Amino acid sequence: MLQRGLSYGEGPFVIWEDIDMRTVCKPGHPVPYSLHDMRVSDITLSDGQLTLQFETGLVRIAEPCVQVDGRVVLTGVESCEVWRLSPNGEYGSFSGKKQTWEKFSRKHPEFSFEVTDELYGFNQVRYEGYLSLPDREKLTEFCMAVYYTGDLIYETEE
C-alpha cells in the first residue's frame, strides 16, 4: 500500500515520494483554459506561429468556469501535421490520410473542427476531435499534432 510522504511539485505535475522508495507522479492540468467542445473556425500558420480562432471562445478552468472570447497561439512551430481518420469515429478498419497543415489547408480552405480532447507534452500539443468539411455530410475523426519550441499563449478578452 502506498504511504504518501513528501509532496512537492510545480506546474503540470505533483510528485509524492513514499517510504518504500517509490516516486508517484500525478499529471495535473497544465493549461488555464479548456478547448473541449469548442469549435475551431480558423487556423493559420505563418512564420512559425500557429493561431487557432474559435467560434465561441474558450472555457476558463478556474472557478467560475466561464466561457470567454479568445484564441490560442503557439510560437516557434517546427511542424504541424494532421490526420483524417474514420467518419464519425467509427470502429473497425478504416483508411486515413496524414498531411502537413500547409497541404491540408490549401486543399480545404473552409472547414470547422470541434475539439474533443487536448493532450500536452514537452514542446508538443495534440488536438483531437471531429472535422466538418462543406462538401461532406459526415464528420471525420481528426487529429492535429504540433511540435513547437516557443510558447503556448491564450489571448483572451478577460
Regions found by a protein language model. Give the residues of each.
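Small/flexible residues
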Residues: 5-6, 128
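Targeting/processing segments of secretory and organellar proteins
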Residues: 2-5, 11-13
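Generic early N-terminus positional signal peaking at residue ~5-7
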Residues: 6-7, 26
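Surface-exposed, interaction-prone regions used to assemble/regulate multi-protein complexes
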Residues: 13-158
